[in-house]
Amino acid sequence: MSDNSQKKVIVGMSGGVDSSVSAYLLQQQGYHVEGLFMKNWEEDDDTEYCSAATDLADAQAVCDKLGIELHTVNFAAEYWDNVFELFLEEYKAGRTPNPDILCNKEIKFKAFLEFAAEDLGADYIATGHYVRRHDVDGKSRLLRGMDGNKDQSYFLYTLSHEQIAQSLFPVGELEKPQVRKIAEELELATAKKKDSTGICFIGERKFTDFLARYLPAQPGPILSVDDNKPMGQHQGLMYHTLGQRKGLGIGGVKDGGEDPWYVVDKDVANNILYVAQGHEHPRLMSHGLIAQQLHWVDRQPLTAELRCTVKTRYRQADIPCTVTPLGDDRITVRFDEPVAAVTPGQSAVFYLDDVCLGGGIIEERLQE
């Protein structure tokens, strides 16, 4: 076993079970471990929704139990400028961004990585993400986590091989039940804490209520895509995403049959929300997509056609596809089979077996 005791690792302690067990596992591997709690959002009047105080207390309790120092840092300004404002801009444009991907890119593997290295003298950072790192020929690769249900590589595709080389992912080799078991055996404060859901800055509150504070409601018509028949009113296109079924306010429609209604398109210029019946309606299906803002983990641009698999959203089954470079940092992706609810603003992430190659932002879906 290599001597890790000279190596300092700063673990991003979120107050959750995964980062808690990560800190313990790194201790067991002999590293000098310290924790860092990041505050990325300034609560104003939302204390009942914001769990930051509880999370910090839980992180502190775990660090006390493990006998490690816990540092704190406030990245709220960086988060607002580099994550939240972009998130709002995308919603205003009628797209559906993924703030967790942005947060990993701008905060956890940029602001945190720089702070840990420069201010705390870290050799590595570590997080509780369910991914694995594999070094080949001097380059670090990003692999899916061993737990297929929890794999989080989709959210980390923007990382470069250099960033991965500076990062450790201890729970990526484990399955979630094993992680909980370790926490319970150690009697860590976070052992039974449920996984956080929802977007980090929104917490458990209703998404539409949160968005309404920053983006004014813009009501407009809901039309049936098949015959332009009025189906109701929406309160704002930003509250709806392609493939959405709930929250449309369309009940039983005369002569409408039993199939539920789905969002199939948004006309941003005219503020129209288009819906159709059935989850396999042709307007919901795509044969491919065009992606931009590409990030390849090895940082080598794609120069030739590539056969691989793609995910257009988290937890989706892998879709076999062919990727073709278009130049100007864009690619065309053609699926072997049509895919439902491919959503502009979301990320398309590419894989070869367990290796995450990288990805990009979906610019448009191809329906032919």
Curated annotation (Swiss-Prot):
GO terms for biological process: tRNA wobble position uridine thiolation. It comes from the Bacteria. The active site is at residues 103, 200. Pfam families: tRNA_Me_trans, tRNA_Me_trans_C, tRNA_Me_trans_M. The record marks 129, 346 as: Interaction with tRNA. Keywords: ATP-binding, Cytoplasm, Disulfide bond, Nucleotide-binding, RNA-binding, Transferase, tRNA processing, tRNA-binding. Residues 98-100 are annotated as: Interaction with target base in tRNA. Residues 150-152, 313-314 are annotated as: Interaction with tRNA. GO terms for molecular function: ATP binding; tRNA binding; tRNA-uridine 2-sulfurtransferase activity. Disulfide bonds join 103-200. Its main location: cytoplasm. The keyword tRNA processing applies. Gene3D superfamilies: Adenine nucleotide alpha hydrolases-like domains, HUPs, Translation factors. Interacts with TusE. NCBIfam families: PRK00143.1, trmU. Catalyzes the 2-thiolation of uridine at the wobble position (U34) of tRNA(Lys), tRNA(Glu) and tRNA(Gln), leading to the formation of s(2)U34, the first step of tRNA-mnm(5)s(2)U34 synthesis. Sulfur is provided by IscS, via a sulfur-relay system. Binds ATP and its substrate tRNAs. HAMAP family: tRNA_thiouridyl_MnmA (MF_00144). This is tRNA-specific 2-thiouridylase MnmA. It comes from Pectobacterium carotovorum subsp. carotovorum (strain PC1). The lineage of its organism: Bacteria, Pseudomonadati, Pseudomonadota, Gammaproteobacteria, Enterobacterales.
